[in-house]
Regions:
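Short glycine/serine/threonine/alanine-rich loop segments
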Residues: 10, 202, 220
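Residue-level recognition of oxygen-bearing side chains
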Residues: 82, 192, 225
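Long amphipathic alpha-helical scaffold regions
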Residues: 92, 179, 220-221
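Helix-turn-helix DNA-binding segment
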Residues: 169-209, 231
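Basic, Lys/Arg-enriched C-terminal extension of HTH/homeodomain DNA-binding domains
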Residues: 215-238
Length: 238
């Protein structure tokens, strides 16, 4: 009986997130060892790349590859799917996603990152956003546990930031919840709030409540401001 109670308590105190019972934003023990070993001598390239870069901007990509180590120790990809596939082999590498040169709407890209960040393998990617793109920076910070960096950072500033690997700003209460995110996706597709209520089989009042939570997290006052923001984020350059 004592053993049964102990096991039950262990289950109760474990994480209620899918996948792992460890802290979702802490690197596993062996990944931390690899991270420390790579930081001892960054002038010597390692088998695992320091950066996994996702961008379609050839000029931006060449800036990393032709730079100094450790930034030049980089594997570059044009799509997020390919990068996530190879990241399984190098869990200690930093995933850096260039938001500016995306080939799809930002909300679609963030949806994919959310599924890999809020659940196993609990990634904490770095998102590069233009300094003057206030809408994208605001939305990315509220979308999940992401490091949002200015795209115009110097090489030294970028290196220091990636080496420090700080905890993501904010907490779960400041990110869009699993009930709010589908509403944002539907709004970005041009659906009305009543249509969303019908699709989700929920009372209209609940959709209005979730909308008010979304507006509060983005610091907006009216849903027209939200629709304008979503319209801006739907544009892509490649």
């Amino acid at each position: 009986m004592r053993m049964t109670v102990r096991r039950y308590r262990r289950r109760r105190t474990g994480s209620d997130s899918l996948g792992s019972t460890h802290s979702p934003f802490a690197l596993p023990f062996f990944d931390r060892l690899e991270y420390l070993s790579q930081s001892i001598n960054q002038t010597r390239k390692t088998d695992a790349p320091f950066i996994i870069l996702v961008t379609q901007d050839n000029y931006f990509r060449s800036g990393f590859l032709s730079g100094q180590s450790p930034l030049s120790n980089c594997c570059d990809y044009s799509t997020l799917d390919a990068a996530l596939s190879d990241l399984n082999h190098w869990p200690s590498s930093r995933l850096v996603v260039d938001i500016e040169s995306r080939a799809s709407p930002l909300i679609d890209l963030l949806d994919q990152l959310r599924r890999h960040s809020l659940f196993a393998p609990y990634l904490t990617p770095y998102l590069l956003v233009r300094a003057d793109d206030y809408d994208a920076r605001l939305f990315c910070k509220a979308a999940g546990p992401f490091h949002v960096l200015e795209r115009q950072l110097t090489a030294l500033g970028m290196q220091q930031t990636l080496l420090e690997a700080p905890a993501p700003a904010g907490n779960r209460k400041e990110w869009f919840s699993r009930d709010e995110w589908p509403i944002l996706q539907a709004l970005s597709q041009g659906r009305s709030l009543r249509q969303i209520a019908q699709l989700q089989n929920r009372p209209y009042s609940r959709i209005i409540y979730r909308l008010s939570c979304i507006l509060a997290k983005l610091g907006l006052n009216h849903r027209h401001e939200l629709l304008h923001l979503l319209n801006n984020l739907s544009d892509f350059t490649y």
